[in-house]
């Protein structure tokens, strides 16, 4: 057991993981030019395993950070020479680095990014995710109440069977396309194709470098409906007419959309202002005067380009705006980051540790200088 602890807590592991992270940063930075920021993050930093050249498997950013976290934890807990008064500064620096890694893990696993679009005079409590989508099935049989069943993107993989107590049928995912476009068929489709796929097919496209510009789509098969609705259907993001089906005398709508998060508070846009560059149609700055409404109580807040609104773990940035025939609408970037405070706290802790270590070393340096002078 002691030998295992000695190996796992070795400082060499920390050095090797730092070097490998530097390699991943270089590879990820270079890859952004070809595949875009989001795809590069997913391939090199969010992945457990990264495939170099599509052939050689190497540790991805997530595994590397886990190894570093375990190594630092064992160093703090089991390195006997760290738990001495003369090493207090080094110990505090290690604890600060450990907190920084924990914060990074929380951010990587639980953080989310999206936007909130609000027209002047309207309010919203909904954030649409930038990256993730969801399959939404709406039972519209009851005129007074729509019943929603939502499946998140991670379970929309090829071959997955979706079922739910609200649904009296099953859905088999045939394919999930990161980016696609509808293409009109040049020949009649088979009788097993239903809805949009009778006249169109979904053609896979190369993913855009900017992930938010991709148009995901799925093809799926409805089974066990015990009706003529059994067959293959298709959906894509931004589809103007939702896919409908009547199954066992129940009316359903099928939609693929950006993943939605509903907040325990709402934001009402009172006034949107923009300042233009002189003689141009380019906006110099813009801001949103809003009401933050929680429990029926409004609080007036001004959101500007460099002054976001922070509330209950969410940060709302003034991102852009939309001008339409019915007026202006603000676009707020909404970020949920559970590890937001960790970099500040860990930086302070590491600074204190470094300062203590330097102060502890001053007497030795002075004695050494005096000996040299003598």
Question: Each predicted region: which residue ranges?
Answer:
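Internal alpha-helical transmembrane segments
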Residues: 56-143, 331, 335-367
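Soluble non-transmembrane domains of integral membrane proteins
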Residues: 114-337
């Amino acid at each position: 057991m002691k030998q295992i602890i000695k190996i796992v807590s070795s400082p060499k592991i920390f050095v090797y993981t730092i070097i490998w992270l530097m390699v991943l940063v270089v590879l990820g930075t270079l890859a952004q030019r070809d595949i875009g920021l989001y795809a590069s993050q997913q391939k090199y930093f969010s992945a457990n395993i990264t495939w170099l050249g599509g052939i050689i498997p190497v540790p991805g950013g997530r595994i590397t950070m886990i190894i570093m976290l375990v190594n630092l934890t064992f160093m703090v807990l089991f390195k006997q020479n760290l738990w001495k008064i003369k090493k207090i500064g080094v110990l505090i620096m290690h604890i600060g680095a450990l907190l920084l890694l924990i914060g990074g893990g929380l951010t990587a696993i639980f953080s989310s990014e999206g936007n909130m679009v609000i027209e002047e005079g309207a309010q919203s409590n909904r954030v649409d995710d930038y990256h993730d989508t969801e399959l939404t099935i709406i039972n519209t049989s009851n005129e007074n109440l729509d019943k929603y069943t939502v499946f998140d993107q991670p379970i929309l993989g090829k071959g997955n069977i979706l079922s739910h107590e609200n649904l009296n049928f099953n859905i088999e995912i045939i394919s999930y396309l990161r980016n696609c476009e509808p293409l009109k068929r040049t020949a009649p489709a088979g009788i097993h194709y239903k809805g949009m796929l009778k006249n169109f097919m979904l053609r896979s496209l190369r993913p855009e470098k900017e992930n938010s510009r991709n148009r995901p789509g799925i093809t799926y098969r409805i089974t066990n409906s015990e009706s003529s609705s059994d067959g293959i259907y298709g959906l894509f993001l931004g589809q103007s007419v939702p896919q409908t089906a009547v199954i066992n005398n129940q009316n359903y709508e099928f939609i693929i959309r950006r993943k939605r998060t509903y907040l325990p508070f709402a934001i009402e846009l009172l006034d949107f202002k923009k300042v233009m560059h002189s003689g141009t149609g380019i906006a110099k700055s813009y801001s949103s005067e809003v009401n933050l409404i929680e429990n029926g109580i409004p609080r007036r807040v001004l959101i500007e380009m460099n002054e976001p609104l922070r509330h209950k773990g969410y940060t709302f940035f003034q991102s852009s705006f939309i001008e339409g025939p019915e007026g202006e609408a603000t676009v707020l970037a909404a970020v949920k980051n559970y590890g937001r405070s960790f970099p500040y706290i860990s930086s302070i802790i590491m600074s204190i540790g470094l300062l203590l270590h330097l102060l502890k070393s001053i007497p030795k340096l002075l004695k050494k200088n005096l000996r040299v002078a003598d």
